[in-house]
Amino acid sequence: MAIQLLPPQLANQIAAGEVVERPASVVKELVENSLDAGATRVDIDIDKGGSKLIRIRDNGAGIAKDELALALSRHATSKVHTLDDLEAILSFGFRGEALASISSVSRLTLTSKTAEQSEAWQAYAEGSQMDVKVTPAAHPQGSTIEVVDLFFNTPARRRFLKSDKTEFTHIDEWLKRIAIVRSDIHFTLTHNAKLVRQYRPANTDIQTQQRLAQICGRAFADQALSIACEHDDFVLTGYLQSPQDTVITDTNFFYVNGRLIRDRLVNHAVKQAFAEYGIEHQPGYVLMLSLDPHQVDVNVHPAKHEVRFHQSRYVHDFILQAVRSALVEMPALPLSDELEHHDNVAPMHTESNLMHDVKVVDTAEDEFTLNHGSSKAINSVSQFGSMHVPGKNNGLSGGYSAAIKPSYDKKPSSASSAQTKTAIANYGQLLHTPMNSAVSYVHEAAPQVTMPPLLAGEHWVICKDDKLSLLPIKSVLLAVRKKDVETKLANGLVSQPLLMPVSIAADLDWIETLAVRDQLLRQMGIELTIRFQQLIIKKVPPYLRECQLAIVIPELLQWIQLEQPTQSAIVGWLAQQSLSQFEPAQALWLQFCSLDDETQQTCYAQERIIPWQNWMKDN
């Protein structure tokens, strides 16, 4: 059979097989076009689950008369014009296929008016007929698209549609997901002329919480942990299901630059953070990640449900650290009086409730940050050290004035209060072992501690008598980590499997090194194998999670190949590598105050005296 170009009608119907899967796919494409057009209100009318009628009405910028026919053509778009535009996409649409594909399998009417036009115009296209008829019409500024008799000319596709109720449920579920991230938009949804959903714009915190409860349920909203973290070009905001809420939920929404996607990296990061509290089920979350569009490729899936991150491991660990921080700040789990005196539940003097005793002197953003130094040194990199809270409050998409806070100060839901005593006791035991490994040796009877103010996220300002000095945070962090590693190393460190094992070229000598130092590596929580001349790094202790493993592990093997390191040397090496991990300033100060006097004095010996008396004399 000879090779020939496909007719435009057939090409559009083939493309429709990828773009238009069901009525919900049509709604998704058309609503996203409305949002790209700057609409602040979108009305969605559905008849018979979308198989009979889908009408989308918006108040966006509209389409000019001369562009109406072109808008229904394949690969016609106003959103990208150059390759550079394609590599930095912030709009929902960019391929120019949706309208052409939809019009090829339905009877489509597009009515639109721009602010510059004195009258509206209407374009009509039907199925395989590629001719577009443009006629005058009456319409306010914006656009209305009617899709009638979906799949009328493709009976095989129409037979695969489910019941009207099922198809409408898919539309309703998709609208919920977009209504969360676009809390500034007024959405309405009607089915068979009956108003089903109305999401009013959320311009205040209370309205935002109301929309969250409307979409995710009151139980989720009442107990959810709010999260807002920023590091370099990454900003993560949203909500996490509280560990106190044991109700299994399907609220797993993740957005990248406002686009709803599915990504296993996110599920793994959230689940790993919760697993450190002993919570094995998949927790609910609504997370919105904003980053440089050059760092993510959205043009990898026909329906744009997936993206490809240029630094997927970096994104995973950023989300992991942000969720860990949210759980650290989580209020202590409320226990009944009977359970508080249960023999199996120890008093919970953990980081979570000790945080209530900390008085923060400096209210600047730097209270929530730790900057561990230059990014040039691998062992000193603070990969997420400058994570802080954006100061501007702008609904779900914006920042928050506190790093992590409960959404509501209300009583736990009935589902939470109905937990069995055994389950609550187990939670209490889990909370007794704080999420952050470095807090495990904090004294049970910790006194009230006032954290000194931070300077540039790198020093604490210490005022004692008439002396003013700067205490380097990095030296304190190193001392705390050494103490933590020393405490745990004797019994062996816990291994954490990598989401994606790291593979590097292996030296011939490493086989013997792994055999000779096998016990040492196991004690350090490191699992390595060699296959096909490749060293595969499978598991590492928490202290190495943020390291450049492809560099650090070979250096370790070279070191232990030449000598048998002492325990103190291993402690120092692991502590040094762990400096790249994020640690909240308040938690670190608590840990520092719990160190023995000798270790504290060693840290204080590194402080820098500020000659403030001389400055006063000079002035």
UniProtKB/Swiss-Prot annotation:
Keywords from the UniProt entry: DNA damage, DNA repair
A GO molecular-function annotation: ATP-dependent DNA damage sensor activity
Pfam families named in the record: DNA_mis_repair (PF01119), HATPase_c_3 (PF13589), MutL_C (PF08676)
Any one GO CC term of the record: mismatch repair complex
Annotated S-S bridges: none
GO BP term, pick one: mismatch repair
Entry keyword DNA repair: yes
PANTHER family: DNA MISMATCH REPAIR PROTEIN MLH, PMS, MUTL, DNA MISMATCH REPAIR PROTEIN MLH1
Family note: Belongs to the DNA mismatch repair MutL/HexB family.
Stated role: This protein is involved in the repair of mismatches in DNA. It is required for dam-dependent methyl-directed DNA mismatch repair. May act as a 'molecular matchmaker', a protein that promotes the formation of a stable complex between two or more DNA-binding proteins in an ATP-dependent manner without itself being part of a final effector complex.
Identification of the protein by name: DNA mismatch repair protein MutL
Organism lineage: Bacteria, Pseudomonadati, Pseudomonadota, Gammaproteobacteria, Alteromonadales
